[in-house]
Amino acid sequence: MELDARMDDLECRQAFQDDTLQALNDVVVEQQRSIERLQLQVAALIKRLEDVQGLVGEAGEDEAPPPHY
C-alpha cells in the first residue's frame, strides 16, 4: 500500500512540475517577444537620432563661426 501512495505522490509532483515548466516556458516566450519588439524600437530610435544629427550637422556647416573666433 505504501508503494501505491508513493507512486501517487510522484505522479502528482510530476504533474505540478509539468504545469510549472509550461508556465515558465510561456513567460520566456513572451519575454523574448518583448525583447524583439524593444530591439526594433531601439533601432528605429537610433535611425531617427542619426537623421536628426545629420540635419543639425548640415545646418551647422553653412553657418559662419561666431564673432569671437
UniProtKB/Swiss-Prot annotation:
Matching entries from Pfam families are given as: SlyX (PF04102)
Residue span of the signal peptide, if any? none
- Sorted alphabetically, which InterPro entries does this protein's record hold? SlyX
Tell me which domain of life the UniProt entry assigns to the organism this sequence originates from. Bacteria
**Which family, according to the similarity comment?**
Belongs to the SlyX family.
Q: What PANTHER family does the entry give?
A: PROTEIN SLYX
Entry protein name: Protein SlyX homolog
